[in-house]
A protein has these predicted regions:
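Iron-sulfur cluster-binding electron-transfer modules in prokaryotic oxidoreductases
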Residues: 321, 328, 446-756
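Short glycine/threonine-rich loop-to-helix capping motif typified by GTGT followed
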Residues: 64, 129-144, 186-195, 253-268, ...
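Ferredoxin-type iron-sulfur electron-transfer modules and their immediate structural context
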Residues: 282-286, 294-429, 434, 448-462, ...
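Conserved phosphate/anionic-ligand binding catalytic regions in large, soluble enzymes, centered on
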Residues: 61-86, 245-251, 255, 287-288, ...
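Flexible, low-complexity linker/loop segments at domain and module junctions
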Residues: 64, 71-92, 142-148, 360-361, ...
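FAD-binding subdomain of flavoenzyme oxidoreductases
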Residues: 1-103, 326-327, 332-333, 337-359
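Terminal amphipathic helices with adjacent charged low-complexity linkers/tails
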Residues: 2-15, 81-88, 106-109, 113-207, ...
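Short, hydrophobic beta-strand segments
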Residues: 92-97, 147-157, 204-218, 252-262, ...
Length: 756
């Protein structure tokens, strides 16, 4: 079905049969419409609209296979296909150019193309001015040159020198940056690739961003004037839009805040689509440059090609599908573009504990953030979604769980709401790692949704035993600290099996031992006014006081007077994992009241357990968004690394390799940039792992074996192991027999005063 010379067509037709009939009719169709095809088909590589009748022209080789590409299931079903591959360059480099606005970026496209790049993409400010980008790409955004729009220009070569040489002229433009590091290139491309999800919901657009006019294309030399006129058309209809796309090929991706909630909004949508079609045709372009026409744009094809060529499309389809059974109503004889718009969702919006300020306070809007991108189904890279990577079950992916919440709120498939066992079972293996919060382009936050669900699911009925054994660990720890020897004897001795069964703990788990003394017992308040408040969390205070003591030494080495809260306080971190939100709220209110003077004074708070810092930076402001004290405490709470970097602390030197296992909550909420910078200043060769590892015993073993344990084995016994999270250190100890250090211990151990 490839290129077919005229003589070969004659032979096929003479042979008869169904193939001969098809080729005869295709050639006859081509001959009748050849003049119109040559006259009206846009001359650009990104023309996806209509059928590829131009591939039947003699000068195109009568290529039947190409003529069928992009028919969108209306003519045939492909069973297999052969494709021609081109060798990829061995080395790539990236030049990024910043512009005042997206039109200025588009104006540069023809000149940039003269440098013969292998890729030229563009994006506007909406792709970087959103919560997902700020959370996930903090370090990457700092690499971008100043501007409100950017061109990303890729060059390739067989060697690094060859690729750099090809990029050199463009990289010399004022304000341009040359990115040679493959890792940094990947991170910049990820910002662009996240466009479809990051622009689907952005309050700066004025509403949700929708497809519809999302992949139009024009010749690259006409791209800028087309974009300028499209912006004017959008403004006339009161629409906002976010732009990105394949600028080097004149293909523009757009997310537009169409109003589908009212009859007037839908009428405006239709008018815009018709006028936008006329606009793109006037510039010699195509309604679709990538995604196809379907029903949404099929009705508009006569405006692009004229009625005669649409008749030719109809005849082309009839050759393959005389009964019109293949995807009817699409492309040919298309249903009206506004005939089958899904009505606004009528989802239940029950009262909730969290505020969901980014979703107008609506749980239904929060859980319907998912647009199906499926990044949670990746097999490697990042921390999302560890349970799915083990089970490979869609219901254990962030996307699958979001869909179950949708079904729960819709009430047709999942009918028992908060009491649903299907939803609870799907959430059971969720680690509440918050990985999706930072890595899902749509900003799905399954850890929060899980806490919300469990809060309601267990209202008025007993919770599973682990909820009481581990969720209430701050209270058990305070009791055990009075007689730690007795407590450890019970937990490590003959009665440990009974205690594990009572607490719902796997028999192969080891229960961590309480320290012989607490950190608070031995802490000496500073002389003089304190300059920093150290947060002695439950795990550090009762299990590892030596970490807090090391932190005090480091902070004093940095010139600070260290205080701690006057009362024993706990942020309630374990409570969220079990949905015990009423108790968690009470804990946070106690903290806000107890720390009122320190909060008012702006005293920095340094946390040592990443998940506790994450509570202050995330859950606190989600539960109390209108509380000024909550907002201030959130903004003045730091990890140890963040605080030391912010203060300009010069750490002591320490050489060697360091394997750093970042707590999943830290990676999701605070990031690891400060840790990387501080350890790098020390002279350590840092490898930051991208992995999760805790939760249900069997699942946690499988998750740990994916990245964490192989990395530790490969590092060798001489490498430093760093893990600030209590659960992370315990998992490493129990699975490898090695002790991972807290950052405070590493810095204090290298400090001159520590060895004095």
């Amino acid at each position: 079905m490839g290129a077919t010379p005229e003589g070969e067509i004659d032979r096929i037709v003479r042979a008869g049969g169904r193939r001969g009939e098809i080729y005869h009719r295709l050639r006859e169709l081509r001959d009748r419409y050849a003049g119109l095809i040559r006259e009206r088909f846009p001359r650009l590589s990104r023309r996806v609209s209509g059928f590829n009748l131009d591939d039947l022209l003699p000068e195109r080789g009568f290529h039947v296979a190409r003529a069928l590409v992009g028919t969108e299931g209306t003519c045939v079903t492909f069973l297999e296909a052969s494709v021609r591959l081109h060798p990829a360059p061995k080395v790539r480099v990236l030049v990024v150019l910043g512009y005042e606005d997206v039109v200025r970026a588009a104006e540069s496209v023809p000149e940039v193309l003269q440098a013969q790049p292998i890729g030229l993409e563009g994006m506007d400010r909406f792709l970087v001015e959103n919560d997902y980008a700020r959370r996930s790409f903090r370090e990457t955004l700092a690499l971008l040159p100043p501007g409100n729009a950017w061109l990303m220009v890729e060059f390739g070569g067989e060697t690094r020198e060859e690729a750099v040489e090809r990029a050199r002229r463009l990289a010399a433009v004022p304000g341009a940056i040359l990115v040679e590091s493959p890792g940094e290139q990947t991170r910049i491309w990820q910002v662009r690739e996240a466009g479809v999800a990051t622009t689907s919901r952005d309050v700066r657009l004025g509403g949700d961003g929708w497809p519809g006019w999302e992949d139009s294309a024009v010749p690259p030399e006409r791209f800028a004037p087309y974009l300028r006129d499209l912006l004017a058309l959008l403004a006339r209809h009161g629409y906002g839009a976010a732009f990105y796309g394949h600028f080097g090929e004149g293909c523009l991706h757009a997310r537009i805040d169409f109003d589908f909630s009212s009859a007037e909004g839908i009428r405006t949508y239709r008018t815009f689509m018709e006028e936008a079609t006329d606009l793109v045709v006037a510039y010699g372009g195509s309604i679709s440059g990538e995604h196809g026409d379907g029903q949404q744009r099929g009705e508009l094809l006569p405006r692009m090609f004229g009625e005669e060529l649409v008749t030719a499309f109809r005849e082309f389809k009839a050759i393959w599908d005389p009964g019109n059974r293949m995807n009817p109503g699409k492309k040919v004889d298309a249903y009206p573009l506004d005939a089958d718009l899904r009505p606004p969702l009528r989802l239940a919006d029950p009262p909730v504990a969290f505020q969901y300020s980014g979703d107008s306070g609506s749980f239904s809007r929060a859980v319907t953030r998912c647009v199906g991108v499926g990044r949670c189904r990746r097999e490697a890279g990042g921390v999302m979604c560890p349970s799915y990577r083990v089970t490979r079950d869609e219901r254990h992916s962030t996307r699958g769980r979001a869909r179950l919440f949708f079904e729960m709120l819709e009430g047709e498939v999942v009918r028992d709401g908060w009491r649903s066992d299907e939803v609870r079972e799907a959430l059971d293996l969720c680690l509440a790692c918050k990985g999706c919060r930072s890595e899902c382009p749509a900003g799905v936050d399954m850890a929060t949704y899980k806490a919300e669900f469990l809060h309601h699911h267990y209202q008025g009925k007993p919770r599973p035993r682990p909820a009481y054994a581990m969720g209430l660990v701050p209270w058990w720890a305070r009791l055990a600290s009075r007689l730690p020897g007795v407590a450890n004897g019970l937990m490590q001795g003959p009665f440990s099996g009974i205690l594990k069964r009572l607490g719902g703990i796997h028999p192969d788990r080891q229960i961590p031992a309480f320290a012989g003394r607490t950190f608070r017992d031995g802490f000496a308040p500073p002389t003089g006014e304190p300059t920093v408040l150290l947060w002695p969390d439950t795990f550090t205070n009762f299990f590892h006081p030596e970490i807090a003591e090391a932190a005090v030494r480091v902070l004093e080495e940095a010139g600070h007077r260290v205080a701690i809260p006057r009362k024993v306080l706990c942020c309630g971190r374990p409570l969220y994992d079990f949905g015990m939100l009423d108790l968690a709220r009470r804990q946070l209110r106690r903290i806000l009241e107890a720390l009122r003077p320190e909060i008012a004074a702006g005293l920095p708070v340094v946390g040592l357990e990443p998940s506790c810092v994450a509570v202050f930076r995330d859950e606190l402001v989600n539960l109390f968004p209108e509380d000024e004290a909550a907002r201030r405490l959130s903004s003045q709470t730091f990890t140890l690394a963040e605080f030391l970097v912010h203060e300009g602390f010069e750490p002591p030197r320490r050489t060697g390799a360091a394997i750093v296992h970042g707590h999943c909550h830290q990676q999701a909420v605070m990031g690891m940039a400060a840790d990387r910078e501080l350890l790098g200043k020390m002279g350590l060769d840092v490898r930051l792992l991208d992995a999760g590892e805790a939760d249900h015993y069997e699942v946690s073993l499988a998750v740990a074996e994916r990245a964490l344990l192989p990395a530790i084995r490969a590092a060798g016994p001489e490498a430093l192991l760093l893990a600030d999270g209590f659960s992370c250190r315990e998992q490493i100890r129990q699975l490898t027999g090695r002790r991972a250090l807290h950052l405070a211990e590493v810095v204090a151990g290298a400090a001159p005063s520590a060895s004095a």
